[in-house]
Structure formats: C-alpha cells, structure tokens
Amino acid sequence: MNVPRETIAAIATAQGRGGVGIIRVSGPLAGKAAEAIIGRTLKPRFAHYGPFVDGTGQVLDEGIALYFPGPNSFTGEDVLELQGHGGPIVLDMLLQRCLQLGSRLARPGEFSERAFLNDKLDLAQAEAIADLIEASSAQAARNALRSLQGAFSRRVDNLTEKLISLRIYVEAAIDFPEEEIDFLADGHVLNMLDDVRAELSTVLREAGQGALLRDGMTVVIAGRPNAGKSSLLNALAGREAAIVTEIAGTTRDVLREHIHIDGMPLHVVDTAGLRDTQDQVEMIGVQRALKAIGEADRILLVVDATAPEAADPFALWPEFLEQRPDPSKVTLIRNKADLSGDPINLQTSVDGHVTISLSARSGGEGLELLREHLKACMGYEQTSESSFSARRRHLEALRHASDSLEHGRAQLTLAGAGELLAEDLRQAQQALGEITGAFSSDDLLGRIFSSFCIGK
C-alpha cells in the first residue's frame, strides 16, 4: 500500500487535566525527536525517565519516554511516546516541540490508519479500537476487545477461504468442460455452496447481535390510543418524557428517548395511537408510527388489559402486521394490570411469542421483567468467547454477500449457469473483503478513520 512518509504527532490522552498525559509521534523522524527532547539515544522498548527539553535546553516537563522502532510498533513505523504530566498547557508545549522538529499534527484516526496501511491490523480491527473506547457497557467492551484481537476478522477470513475454494471448483468446471468429473452437476459445488451459506448466516446473526450491543436497539412502543404507551415510555426513561392524559390521541408525533439498561443503549420510540382518524395532524402521526414500526429492532405492542379486545390484539390491526411481518420481534405488553387484575408475569407461547403483564403507572410493577426481557433481546450475558463487535456497514456487507450466494444458488439449480454463479461468488468475496479492508475505496477509509479520536 502507499504508506505516507511524513512524521505525525498528537496528544493521545483525553482533553482536560489528568495525572498523566501522552504525546505520540510516528514516522521516520520519531528517533530524531526522541534524541532532541530527551538528549540521548533511547534503547528500544525500554522506559527512560528524565527531563523533556525545548530547543534551548529549557526543561518543559519530566516523565517517561518510550521508543519503538518500526516495524515492531503499533503503526509499523518508528514510534515515540512521551508520558508526562496531564496538564493541557504542558502537553501543548511538548506537542509544539515535536512539530518544530519536523512532525505535523496528526488527523483524527491517522495512527490507526497507518497501522492498517502497514498491515498491522485489518479494517475491522481498526474500527474495534474506536468501539472499545466508546463502549457503553462491559459487554460491548468485551466484544470490541475480541474484535480487536481478530475474532470477527477470523470468521470473515474463514468464509473468504471457503469462497475461494468454491470458486476454484466452479472455474475449473467452466474452463475444462471436457473433463470426466462435472463438479456443477454431481452436487459437490452445491454442497459446498450450502455450507458457506449456512456459515455466513450464522456470522450475520452474530454480527447483528454485536451491532445491537454497540449501537443500541431501537424499541418502538406501538398500540391503540390510550393503551398507556406514553406511561410506559416515562417508566422506562425514569422521567416525564411524554405528556400523559386520559384523552385518547394525546401523542400525535413520534417521541424519541435514549436510555440505558445496565449500560446497554436503547433508543425508545413512543408513537401515536394506531386508529382510523379524520384529523389531519393525527393522520400524519399514525403514518409516522407505521414507518417507525417498519424500522424497529423490537416492538412493544401495548394493549389495555381492561379492554375486551385485549384477548386477541394481533387480530385488530392488519396494518400493523403488514409493517412488521416478523412476529418474533414483537413483544405483547398487557398494560394496566393493576386495574385488570392480571398477575404480573412474563409468558412465552408455544410459537415463541412473549407476553408481559405489567402496570406502567402503578409503581412500575412488572417493569423489571420488561427490562430483563429487552436485555435478553440484545444478547446481554448471552455472548460466548467467540462473540464480537460489529457495525452497520459490516451487516450491509454480509447481507450483500448472502444475497449474492442466494442468487448464485438459484442460477445453478434452475439454469445450471456456472458462469453466473462464478460472478455471484466473486461479488460475495468482494463484499466480505470490504469488512477487513481487502477491498476498500479511499472514500470509505477516509470516513472510517475520520471518526476516530485524534491521537488514535
């Protein structure tokens, strides 16, 4: 790859005051900077304590200096780390000294970008650094660390190797049709293809779970007017986020509240009550509610347990089921259990439907059941040593690869079209390569690394 030769420098610790502050330098001038600031040649990978001096010999600070010659460093280049006191003025003076010695100020994420360009880590691992820093729960941090250590990349690389093997068989059958063994016709290729599809499906499911832990789950509260949707939002948020009255149709727009349950991020959306109406403003609210339902990761379908139609709420709203055809993502909330006399509990039906009876306003009875249920939906405490962190772009790439394999299988089974299957396999491999950076445009790399902290 085209690795830049400029030397870069930046403050690597968070803004503000602290006990320790770190300046990081990477590039061909790092060794020269070390000698100028410390006053002597540093032994590689040893901690050297002493004063940090400016161009006139005046002491700027004192602390520990570490020198890592490339390629045995984080970036793969010569790297210098100066660990001094964490005052912003002191750190800025030390940074200015590095810039005077020929370094330039690093862009956000440029150290990680250079590590990627020097093959010290792949793109998924580089992104995991930012995910680890921004983790909002212990579970998300553990997943990000596993991705940084290569758990996700190994799964993708294994899929890629299987795709390459499959492509070899397909290309051989196309290029040498006169051979006695026809891999396309004897079922060997189809079996290999189905094996890759099954493994890809597993990785996609696990990546989806990892993305929820990283980005948070979008939970939409839906139901008829006056079922207690806004009361449920307030109970989950722990504050009066929505206006609650006895008047049906009080909520006319989509309300969004960001909450955490044991550190797990949730984006809770309260919607207008679903009903036929002639009110233009309320109609817009209903349309927005249906749109939110279609985009949700989890839907809390709230019904008034005291109403006679609460016995079979799904039969009431065909438009609801049209927006969310996957019933596995719907949790039925029987609200107002304090008035109906329903016991506070969580029940799972034979077909997997979960129903929770609670009271959103009566001291939040049953709310803890709902919180635990939402945590379970996000995969809280259900991850294994192989689980990993993932991003939305990773999911898009995995889905693209999956779609290509599905299309290729149809071409093979319906038309025996080996050439078209070969192209679909190529596209699937390229989609997987976008995850680790084997196939990545400069624009994509720029967007990814610009989201990092300066000094990372």
Swiss-Prot record:
Q: Where does GTP bind?
A: 226-231, 245-251, 270-273, 335-338, 359-361
| Residues binding K(+), per UniProt | N226, T245, I247, T250
The biological process GO terms on file are:
tRNA methylation; tRNA wobble uridine modification
EC number, UniProt record: 3.6.-.-
Which residues does the record give as Mg(2+) binding sites? S230, T251
Between which residues do disulfide bridges form? Answer: none
Key words, A-Z? Cytoplasm, GTP-binding, Hydrolase, Magnesium, Metal-binding, Nucleotide-binding, Potassium, tRNA processing
UniProt-listed InterPro entries: G_TrmE (IPR031168), GTP-bd (IPR006073), GTP-bd_TrmE_N (IPR018948), GTPase_MnmE (IPR004520), MnmE_dom2 (IPR027368), MnmE_helical (IPR025867), P-loop_NTPase (IPR027417), Small_GTP-bd (IPR005225)
Record's Gene Ontology CC terms? Answer: cytosol
The UniProt record gives the binding positions of (6S)-5-formyl-5,6,7,8-tetrahydrofolate as: R24, E81, K120, K456
Required cofactor names:
K(+)
Q: What class of enzyme is it?
A: hydrolase
Predominant location: cytoplasm
From the Swiss-Prot or TrEMBL record, state where the protein is found.
Cytoplasm
Known SUPFAM superfamilies for this protein? P-loop containing nucleoside triphosphate hydrolases (SSF52540), TrmE connector domain (SSF116878)
User: Which molecular-function annotation in GO is an example for this chain?
Assistant: GTPase activity
Cofactor info, note text: Binds 1 potassium ion per subunit.
- Please list the residue ranges annotated as the TrmE-type G domain: 216-379
What family does the database annotate? Answer: Belongs to the TRAFAC class TrmE-Era-EngA-EngB-Septin-like GTPase superfamily. TrmE GTPase family.
Do you know which PANTHER family this protein is assigned to?
TRNA MODIFICATION GTPASE GTPBP3 (PTHR42714), TRNA MODIFICATION GTPASE GTPBP3, MITOCHONDRIAL (PTHR42714:SF2)
Q: What does this protein do?
A: Exhibits a very high intrinsic GTPase hydrolysis rate. Involved in the addition of a carboxymethylaminomethyl (cmnm) group at the wobble position (U34) of certain tRNAs, forming tRNA-cmnm(5)s(2)U34.
Q: How does it assemble?
A: Homodimer. Heterotetramer of two MnmE and two MnmG subunits.
Q: What is this protein called?
A: tRNA modification GTPase MnmE
This protein's species is: Pseudomonas syringae pv. syringae (strain B728a)
